Each structure stands twice: as C-alpha cells, then as structure tokens.
C-alpha cells in the first residue's frame, strides 16, 4: 500500500481527532524557502511538546517569513496561516483563533513593547506573504 507525504499529512495527521495539533505545520515542512526551517534534531515523543513550541517561536522570529511593520500597523505572516487557518481556530492545543495565536507569540513577531501590545490587542491589519516554493538550500 503506497502512500506519499501529502497522504500522511492530510489523510492521517490532520484528520480530525487524530492528533488535533495545529503546530504540526511547523514540523511537517516541504523544504521550500516559504516553509519553517528544518530542525537539526529529530522529533521525539519525549521532547515533542518542547520541540513544537520551540519551532513556533523560531518561525515567528524569522522576519523573512513573519513580521510586523509598526509604521503601517501591518502584521505580515506566512501564507501557511492562511492555508491552515482553521487548524489554528479549532481550539486544539490552546489555539482558538489566528488573532490569539499571533497574540501568544507577539514577543517574537514584534521588537518593541508597543508593537507587541498592538499585536496582543488585535490592533493591526493582517496580510499573508506570498509563498516561496523554491527549494531551501542547505546552510
């Protein structure tokens, strides 16, 4: 019985009731420039919670993929949050909405306390960045 990676992600992992974990989008990456960076270590059951949380914090800290422009009040985030919005609005793993997700990681999305406060209060215009499908070279 053959399976491809999309079957595993969409048909097994994202199936409602299977794992109900929105942070999976930080772990399952296609190695394109638009994806979160690959980890240097393997995911393990013992460390999975910490690894997923670390992945979210690292992804939101990456200004090429997510950023807040204080001058325009615009939060520009990865297209992943557009494509998988419902996963972050499901209430699973403490994620009830995109706004709540961004508020949780405001300290990673913005550099100043004022900008972080605006994100936490939802006082921003949201834009999704274009997704870069080019292969992410090894660094």
Feature map (PLM): residue ranges:
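C-terminal region detector
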Residues: 1-139
